Amino acid sequence: MKNITIYLLLALACLGLQSCLFQEENYFDDSSANRATADVNRCSELLKAAPNGWVMEYYIGKDYSLGGITLLCRFDGQRVTMASQMSEADETVSSLYSVKSEQATMLSFDTYNYLVHYFGQPQGSMSDDPNGTLGGDYEFIISSASAERIELKGKKYGNRIVMKA
């Protein structure tokens, strides 16, 4: 019994004395913070670079249950100007937006814009959503972005939104 205890203590000592050196291999050329900043800058430039703006196919309702609308968006600086079939023919709505990095690169409409925020504000008995909204998002995760097409996913309801240049 005494020999078993000695061998057990010796084995534990050997396991405890192994090297704690951990060399992590870099899989990327740059740090995650620099890559996130570069992606935010790239997406911001893509939004502003479309000469005629973007056509946003905006869907509302859980699992697209309430259909969608088309929004025409032009991004410049920190402002977005929008027009829609919901507004008058010559009416545009302007508000602030931002592209930021949270858990992913996100497009957020920061100030109230009734063409987008209307669907995310409480509507009372008009909706089936427990939050009382029509199921619209105003914060979107940028899934993919190119000069011709940007794919978004609503942060709260998860509906896929497509923007085409």
Label every model-predicted segment.
Residues 1-8:
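Bacterial N-terminal signal peptides that target proteins for export
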Residues 11-12:
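Repetitive helical segments and hydrophobic/amphipathic motifs
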Residues 15-19:
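C-terminal motif of bacterial Sec signal peptides marking the signal peptidase cleavage site
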Residues 21-106, 114, 145-147, 155-157, ...:
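Acidic/polar, low-complexity intrinsically disordered N-terminal segments immediately downstream
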Residues 28, 110-165:
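Beta-sheet ligand-binding and adhesion/scaffold domains
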